[in-house]
């Protein structure tokens, strides 16, 4: 099973396919975990319309080709074909894909860290779709597509919201009737958590401070922007709220 395979692979040099699935796109990187190197990366765009695959092996120029990809399942197949290509690929067979990591935007209150994906996790991600209707359904499409093609490969969900679940109640509760939280889980969740986690740990390392003793303000600046406050290695506040748009 996937769980047993994860246990067997611990301590092994793992090759991991990382997937960030949107409604009509699929970004990916293929990573050697021991060397901390990106072996290949790319993006499938316009899935379901006029699909294209952009692919680049590390150290080589990227190439974009038109591909017929009615669904994300075909997109994943093209990605795997590119990774196994005799001239541009980086692996010889699917057996070299040790795990798949999926970016999932909203994990609600339940997930405080990355988790191995099983049916219960998938069901809860679906439950959280009302909180992230543009993101979670697309993330689930990517998970289902990978499960269909690689049913025995362990898959992990990495949540944007997980890092911020250490916030105290005074930081995540709104000044609204409590029943809105009790019934609809309306509260501050925070996003860009994977970025905030990495940057805060890297900053502590660079200034020579133990992460558990760090006090930091972390900024994520990209397609979106957010700020978080870190105290003793734990997020205590963040600028984004119920949704990434707040």
What are these regions (language model features)?
Residues 13-17:
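Extreme N-terminal starter segment of soluble prokaryotic enzymes
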Residues 25-69:
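Short glycine-rich, Thr/Ser-proximal phosphate-binding strand/loop in the N-terminal lobe
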Residues 50-98, 128, 142:
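Conserved active-site "lid/cap" helical segment
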Residues 70-74, 78, 116, 120, ...:
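Conserved active-site and cofactor/substrate-binding residues in soluble primary-metabolism enzymes
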Residues 83, 87-135, 156, 162-171:
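Short beta-strand-loop/turn "lid" adjacent to the catalytic site in phosphate-handling enzymes
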Residues 125-136, 153, 182-193:
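Flexible, glycine/proline-enriched loop segments at strand-loop-helix junctions
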Residues 163-246:
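Glycine-rich phosphate-binding loop of actin/hexokinase-like ATP-binding domains
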